[in-house]
């Protein structure tokens, strides 16, 4: 299955992205990205994480969740509490950066590194 990721900004605080990967790979990528950001997290259920993440030097609270779909996994990143003074465009950039970090991790691990082997 070769399905391109499809991102849909919901509002400035939320982004949904359908990734062409199995749910377990997306969950693993979330753990790896949270570790890379040095972020502590709370696992709310089997599909949702809450975390304080510093993006571009601004620490904000995010919800990151996954939902398995017929053709991949839907990743939803929502900024629950922005850093004080963060503009709407700053919020959108931060949400996009977190979603892109997860997507890029998956691409690197499952696509690019496989080609190098």
Q: Language-model segments: which ranges?
A:
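Ser/Thr-rich, low-complexity intrinsically disordered terminal regions
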Residues: 1-117
